[in-house]
Amino acid sequence: MFFCEISRCFRSFYRYTLAFLLFCLSSLTSNANEQQAEIQQLLADYDLAGIVWTTFDDGQKNSSFSGFANIKSNRRMQLDTKVQVGSVGKVVLAVGVLHLITTGKIHLNDSVEDLLPTLDWQNHWSNNAPITIEHLLAHTSGLDNIKMWQLLNSSTKPDTPLAEAFLNTDPHILTPRFEPGTQYSYSNMGYSLLGMIIQAVTRKDYEDYMDSLLEKLNMNDSTFNFVTQGSDSRLAMGYFEGTNPQIAVPMLLRPAGQFTTTVNDMSQFIQFLLGNGMSDNERIVQAALMNRLGVPKGTFAFESGLEHGHGLALAKRDRHGAIGYCHPGETFGFYANLCLFPEEKKGYFFAINTDNESALYDDFNRTLINQLNVRKATENYEAGSFNNPQQDISGLYILSPNNMLEFHWLDYMFNSIYLTATESGFKVYSLQQEEFEITTVGKFLYRRDGRINTSHVYYHDGQFAFISDGLNTYKKSSLSFLLLNWFVLILGCFALIVLIARGAVVSVRGFKKGINPILLPFSVLCLLAIPVYLYSQQSFLDFGEQTAASISLAVVSAGFPFACLIAALLYAKEKKLKSFDALITLIALMLALYLTVNDVLPIIFWK
């Protein structure tokens, strides 16, 4: 009897256990199916070709795919499909540099100016603040991000020497825009310089050094060498705005964005990043350096109390209720993102083979964060609990610096922010995004709506006031001066419209009453049709080169101020300066001079 009871109990236990396991399995399958369906819906909503992704949860890897690797051939994405991930490759390159530091070849505080002495450095702070390897890794060197001719240049070859990216006639290409180490400002040039440092130290091509490191990381399907869809059939086709194919093209700043990989290799890389710097019992990166991958250090914003920013490889981000360390990447026809949550040993990566400006790629981050069930961060303060007197920091703030120096005027006019005080903090207004509120949570510390922790900090460097979110820094500026700029721009644009209309009318009426000087600037504006046509006939990859289109644009745009000036002088000679046409010409001349002073005219993209 006793054994019968034991047998019945065992059978019952077995049935219940089996039922429980089947329930768990069905739940997991259901969750996986829901995630797959949600991602497929996002692909359809944003007209994206395909995606590969992987999640890592405390040792458990889960990789998947959806959509097309090549629409024309009807080839679908697979786990072994290769993708190009742009700036996500910077994280891998950073590990390569940290490996050189770990092995004693170089040091974080080594001067880059000493390691690359043949380049024309123009660092005005070199005596007290030389640019170091740490500055390049953390994007705090002060160097500009990228020039148009470095980005769009069809003459670039896969083996073009890296130094050619810095041998342009521009004498200020290696001039920091702020004291190195004091601010964050994303720089593709900086990571290309890291590639040059690797070559100088190892005496081999950086691609070969990095590929040997990839073997140590067990990333055998990845490479820093140039790969095309023609040379490797496993590489997915890139797409622009839906179904417009874009083959892989070589880059001048290739250490900053040339990296081909697979979702399985990136899963392996996530596992390494969440570890202590070891791979197959070999020390790749010191544990102390691994702890700094996403931790900012030394900037004014960090020293003023803001913990968010960029570390040696990743940026600390506060999104969707979770705090992670991430790095996105874009390249021709691809978008990718890598995120880690070290405290929970979790992470994810995804790559999409479509670059669509209207797509909200952050929706994929939200989906994968939810799939990983990342623990939601909790506030370490109560909103509105800061009782110290709040200083009014209202006013206009301009990007300092902006992302690309050659577009500084555009960012000044269209990408500044304005703060107005509220009961609990400040409203932030911008032409580029919807208004949002930042709530006071500490002395000059603020939290943005939808964030968990402090997102902004206000500080003073002894000369200027700034507000920063760790990745974008704004300097306080004069609102009245910006409004004056807008007045000149609007008045000048109105004058251009009238000038074109008057020029057309005068041209139709003929020259019975003599030649009207307004026809001179009008004719120059008509000549803009030449570069417009030539640009429509060339590849966008030639945009940064000296072509017939770019040269004609430079000549015509340079000629417009002179045409306005000559026309004004002719009106003066004819004693017609008080005429309507003369007034319009003078206002157009004012606009031309204004744009010239602000380095907008002449329009040159190859400098």
Regions found by a protein language model. Name each.
Residues 1-12:
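N-terminal secretory signal peptides that target proteins for export/translocation
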Residues 17-27:
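Bacterial N-terminal signal peptides
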Residues 30-32:
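Boundary at the C-terminal end of the N-terminal hydrophobic targeting segment
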Residues 35-83, 105-107, 121-126, 154-159, ...:
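Short, conserved catalytic-motif segment at the N-terminal edge
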Residues 59, 84-112, 191-199, 266, ...:
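Active-site SXXK
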Residues 60, 65-71, 124-342:
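Short, surface-exposed loop or secondary-structure junction motifs
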Residues 62-64, 337-354, 465-469:
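Short, well-ordered beta-strand elements
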Residues 362-607:
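Peripheral terminal and inter-domain segments
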